[in-house]
């Protein structure tokens, strides 16, 4: 029987998290999975061991203060991509992956000639964390 199967999950063990948090605090993930798509996330959830384990979602690391190693599987959000979904006379609907850098995304919209987010430039974080982290305060 011939068929296509999804590639194995890239599960990393003993990952140093110092470069994945803005303060550079020492911490290590016993297990880390880089989430680059919705399909990858679904595969983690459906995995016999990873699916049952506690999860710790890590975005850009700008609002994380590690006081100890996470006691969970670290899911590093790395979903990338930006695109114009719809253009209206008074607005542009843009879709961006949760792993995209927020400031870079703001700069990209301005470079496309789509104003509106410029007052949110230079705020640290990722697009995926925007509603609940630094950007959500504005």
Task: Put a short name on every predicted segment.
Residues 2-138:
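Anion-binding (especially nucleotide phosphate/pyrophosphate-binding) glycine-rich loop
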């Amino acid at each position: 029987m011939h068929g296509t199967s999804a590639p194995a999950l890239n599960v990393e063990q003993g990952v140093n998290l110092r470069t994945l948090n803005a303060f550079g605090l020492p911490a290590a993930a016993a297990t880390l999975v880089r989430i680059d798509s919705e399909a990858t996330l679904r595969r983690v959830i459906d995995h016999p061991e990873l699916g049952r384990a506690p999860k710790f979602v890590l975005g850009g690391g700008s609002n994380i203060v590690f006081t100890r190693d996470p006691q969970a599987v670290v899911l590093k959000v790395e979903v990338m991509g930006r695109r114009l979904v719809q253009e209206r006379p008074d607005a542009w609907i843009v879709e961006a992956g949760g792993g995209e850098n927020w400031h870079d995304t703001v700069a990209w919209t301005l470079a496309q000639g789509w104003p509106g987010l410029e007052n949110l430039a230079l705020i640290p974080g990722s697009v995926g964390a925007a509603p609940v982290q630094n950007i959500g305060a504005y």
